Amino acid sequence: LLAKKMIEAGACAIQIENQVSDEKQCGHQDGKVTVPHSDFLAKINAVRYAFLELGIPNGIIVARTDSLGAGLTKQIAVTNEPGDLGDQYNSYLDCEEISAEELKNGDVIIKREGKLLRPKRLASNLFQFRAGTGEDRCVLDCITSLQNGADMIWIETEKPHVGQIKAMVDRIRDVIPNAKLVYNNSPSFNWTLNFRQQVFDKWTEEGKDTSAYDRDNLMSADYDDSELGNEADKMISSFQKDGSAHAGIFHHLITLPTYHTAALSTDNLAKGYFSREESMLAYVKGIQREEIRQGIACVKHQNMAGSDIGDNHKEYFAGDAALKASGEDNTMNQFNL
């Protein structure tokens, strides 16, 4: 029903993810909990049917997996036979082998290959995956999603690293050769630090002298114009191109960049405006003059608020008696350059 409402409102693409809905976290935070594949695939099918019922045969479904950083599941998957999808999901659980005599009241037990296994269950009643299984789970998530109606996949990673992304996409494309990846160039990453560390580690492996750099302090402004800093910036500037060329990224997106631009510009304006050195010049030089030079329409903020449209309405209904805002005394005329 929600998907249909979104489509009716104009959505041509819908992204869904494999986290539980009631305890969902940001994809770059800890404490993520995933659902078994049967639950996730049911959602994909529901979205596809919503598109089809509304007469849209080419609606886009993006299936996102948060499994790389998710160490928990809310439930054990239903499995009917060894090797089925539920059994594969459960195979990643952190279990201990026990005997029938070791069973305790309320224990949840899995039988696999003739063994009794007790999954590690937390006080929250969530079950824990084995450490180091994130990439394997991501690959399985993506393959099954594409096989069951998704058009594109989205893997949420903990760092922007072309090699890591490529390794997973290559495995997916072994099964789905035309798999297309959506990637989030997220502000949640510290891009400067990540790429400086990548350069530092690469140079170390190559035997290059890195004694001039402190790996634990690579965010220092002292390195902004250094050879390492410049090399990291080159890698950042080519990340999208490299990701598409080598890691199968079909669509690059960036989440909430305007949140950060608004915060930074407001902070800078406040500091300058209330300083003795700049005062009003902070706004004029840093904002208004640049709006004029770059032809930003918002410099005429009255127009952007609809004053010209209001004048049209006034003139239509009142004719010559209309009191229009766009007369010669309107200061907005100062921007008609």
Q: Over which residues does each language-model region extend?
A:
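Extracellular/luminal recognition modules and glycoprotein regions
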Residues: 298-307
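A SIS-like phosphosugar-recognition module
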Residues: 192, 260-261
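Alpha/beta enzyme core
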Residues: 1-253, 267, 271, 307-337
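Acidic, glycine-enriched catalytic cores built around paired aspartates
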Residues: 291-292
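Polybasic, proline/glycine-rich intrinsically disordered low-complexity segments
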Residues: 276-287
